């Protein structure tokens, strides 16, 4: 039981929260490309991303695992994102720091989605049962390359007017 829910029910809740984080994050990145802040969608993205990390830490932990490492990294990156946006208000270098951190937060959610897809989706699991096979590595490399490109474009395009 986790928070009064079966592990299965809690897992479904965690996945729904994560999918909301990914969906809203993609909208936020689209806003960056158009130089729009999208404050409500951004708040949803950051909140659900934080909730994804928090709920991820509530699963049973048996020693340090790559999943735990990604969760810790996600929290650090999210803290930088929040600081750049809400404390420094995207002023000067904080604008591009925010872009990098926000897109990295989204990337980490997608990275875990890919990992879990290869674990849970039988067709993908058959291609890479241990996540060390080429189909898994190629997929993760492609996702990383796409997110690097997204980050570079967002850094150039995201130049919102200063908040008053």
For the regions a language model picked out, list residue spans one by one.
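Polytopic transmembrane helical bundles with strong interfacial aromatic enrichment
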Residues: 2-164
